[in-house]
Amino acid sequence: MGGGNMFTRREFLKTTAATGALAATSGLAAPAIAQDAAIKLGYVSPQTGPLAAFGEADKFVIDSFLSTTKSMGLNYEVVVKDSQSNPNRAAEVAKELIVDDEVNLILVASTPETTNPVATTCEVEEMPCISTVAPWQPWFIGQQGNPGDPTSWKPFNYAYHFFWGLEDVIAVFTNMWSQIETNKKVGGLFPNDGDGNAWGDKVVGFPPVLEKMGYALTDPGRYQNMTDDFSAQINAFKSGGCEIITGVVIPPDFTTFWNQAKQQGFAPKIASIGKALLFPQTVEALGNAGHNLSSEVWWTPSHPFKSSLTGETSSQVAEAFTKATSRPWTQPIGFAHTLFELAVDVMKRADDPTDSDVVAQAIAATKLDTLVGPIAWDGKNLPPFAAKNVAKTPLVGGQWRLKDGGGYDLVITDNKTAPNIPVGGKMEAIA
């Protein structure tokens, strides 16, 4: 059988359902979805495993979404799946949502290890998918058949993504570094995963930009996640005279690295780390040693945006989370909330929520002001190859500051990349 004639299981289900409906109505086409049938959303995120901090707010966001839509007279069902922080599991549960649960749209969040296998599965199965919380390069390039050959890259028909890119995080980090006097020697912590390979890439990652800006990068090579000994990296950074550390590290690994760096007498002036330092619990786990660690900041209670679904401000959503959970707010709250804002907006505009092509077209036509800023897949500030499938959101930089009574505050220290997001202070050296 030629590849062109291969039926996806989804097409088979759609065709048999349609012929069944026609037969049952003696030739009169039935409406595509019964008036009172729920619109079914699938949601995938890492709720357990080393990436679980990303999924901490999911239950709160989904519970709020279901009560909001119910009060608006909208009928939604959300089928939640845990990727267990495992890419193979993420692909499996995406297939389950499509084949067994027959969802109308899949939403997925948090790191390329979650977003990519889900988006790839959706693309193959012709299931519309909206993803977030992974820089767009590892999301888009990482799903290509040949990531090393840009001429072979193809856009997607069903997978759409919103977040910032490596160009943004590099700008944010170097803007923060320029506020402090250093020898411009940088140590890179890049693991052997989707993010690490992209951030450390000699073409799209940190190396070429840092070189152009006069920074000397010491990159000891890719390491495996869940490493328990960072002595080789620490020795390389000491030998290189590094006063700045950067990289993209999963939360448990940064705790190991930072504790070992302290024990081995390595004390950089700046540590700007992606991924690990997004979360208060990672910083709290370091005791006082988390003071003045810096990170990318994609959403905070002071972001000047409102939910299109509830009208709540960023600060109201963050307060509601803390009230419901007794936990400090975390950055993924804003993006998880926005996934559901987009779902409602898309389904409102899709004439037939059960038709994958109609839903995908509605996603492509989105123009929505959300809790994380304006979202439109219009190609703005993107290279042509990613213009169809990626929408960019703003990024700033911040530092964790010890509070008098214990715990930490995240203070925005640089907003050159998004001046509408207010700063709360200036960069301070760690030591």
For each predicted feature, which ranges?
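Beta-alpha junction/loop-to-helix N-cap segments that form part of ligand/metal-binding clefts
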Residues: 53-60, 68-145, 162, 223-230, ...
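N-terminal secretory signal peptides and thylakoid transit peptides that target proteins
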Residues: 4-23
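Segments of small-molecule ligand-sensing domains
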Residues: 320-333, 344-410
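Hydrophobic alpha-helical
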Residues: 112-123, 228-229, 235, 240-264, ...
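C-terminal segment of N-terminal export signals and the immediately downstream linker at the start
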Residues: 2-6, 28-46
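Extracytoplasmic "Venus flytrap"
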Residues: 42-61, 81-88, 110-111, 189-200, ...
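Extracytoplasmic ligand/sensor domains, especially the bilobed periplasmic-binding protein
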Residues: 103-220, 270-295
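Extracellular/periplasmic periplasmic-binding protein-like sensory domains
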Residues: 136, 261-337, 349-350, 413-419, ...
